[in-house]
Each structure stands twice: as C-alpha cells, then as structure tokens.
Amino acid sequence: MVVGIGIDVVQLKRFLTLVETSDCFAKRLLTSNELNSYWKLNNNQRANFLAVHWTLKEAIYKATSHIKPLFTKLEIYKLNNQYRCEFIQNINLLLSVSYTNCHVSAICLAQQNG
C-alpha cells in the first residue's frame, strides 16, 4: 500500500555556493558515512553530492512526513547503480533521481510492507 509520494527539485548552483562558503550545511544534512564520502570529493563533485542527497532526503521527508524523519538519520547509498535508503522496517522507499546541467530532481514512493 502506498503511504506517500514526495518530490523535490533544486538548482545545482545553489549547492556550489554552499560548498564554496561553508561545511555547516553538509554537516547538518549528511550522516557520518555520507560525510566520509563527501570529504573525498572536489567542490563540483561535492555540490552534486549535496544536491542529490538534499533532493532525495526532501522527497523522502515529504513522502513520510507523518513519521517526521530526521535528515541525519536517513542514509542514502547506491546499490547496483540505484539510490537506496534504509528507513524503518515496515516501509519500503522507491527512489529516483534525474539530472540536467542546472537542476537535480528526486522522487520517492513510500510503500507499507505487508
């Protein structure tokens, strides 16, 4: 059963500005594992990484707003070239991300298991 759908779209240049000015946003958004990956990237890669993680976490939040998940508890990772996020046991999250030169969009479909 579908319990929620969330979508988010952002401009990449916003995230390049964030990356060039401070690490505060990354520390508030990312889990410790995500931060470890983030620190290994150059500024352009960091901007893309943040944009993808922000849009996915926003889409997840919108799809599961009745639960009010914390962004730092949502860990995004890639498996078989698809983004994944372990949430809570009885909810399955289906995620999709799309890119253009200027924008990143993400959608989340949250389904109740069982």
From Swiss-Prot:
<dbReference type="GO" id="GO:0006633">
    <property type="term" value="P:fatty acid biosynthetic process"/>
</dbReference>
<dbReference type="InterPro" id="IPR004568">
    <property type="entry name" value="Ppantetheine-prot_Trfase_dom"/>
</dbReference>
<dbReference type="GO" id="GO:0008897">
    <property type="term" value="F:holo-[acyl-carrier-protein] synthase activity"/>
</dbReference>
<comment type="similarity">
    <text>Belongs to the P-Pant transferase superfamily. AcpS family.</text>
</comment>
<dbReference type="InterPro" id="IPR002582">
    <property type="entry name" value="ACPS"/>
</dbReference>
<dbReference type="InterPro" id="IPR037143">
    <property type="entry name" value="4-PPantetheinyl_Trfase_dom_sf"/>
</dbReference>
<dbReference type="Pfam" id="PF01648">
    <property type="entry name" value="ACPS"/>
</dbReference>
<keyword id="KW-0479">Metal-binding</keyword>
<feature type="binding site">
    <location>
        <position position="58"/>
    </location>
    <ligand>
        <name>Mg(2+)</name>
    </ligand>
</feature>
<keyword id="KW-0444">Lipid biosynthesis</keyword>
<feature type="binding site">
    <location>
        <position position="8"/>
    </location>
    <ligand>
        <name>Mg(2+)</name>
    </ligand>
</feature>
<keyword id="KW-0276">Fatty acid metabolism</keyword>
<keyword id="KW-0460">Magnesium</keyword>
<dbReference type="GO" id="GO:0005737">
    <property type="term" value="C:cytoplasm"/>
</dbReference>
<protein>
    <recommendedName>
        <fullName>Holo-[acyl-carrier-protein] synthase</fullName>
        <ecNumber>2.7.8.7</ecNumber>
    </recommendedName>
</protein>
<dbReference type="GO" id="GO:0000287">
    <property type="term" value="F:magnesium ion binding"/>
</dbReference>
<keyword id="KW-0963">Cytoplasm</keyword>
<keyword id="KW-0443">Lipid metabolism</keyword>
<comment type="function">
    <text>Transfers the 4'-phosphopantetheine moiety from coenzyme A to a Ser of acyl-carrier-protein.</text>
</comment>
<dbReference type="InterPro" id="IPR008278">
    <property type="entry name" value="4-PPantetheinyl_Trfase_dom"/>
</dbReference>
<keyword id="KW-0808">Transferase</keyword>
<keyword id="KW-0275">Fatty acid biosynthesis</keyword>
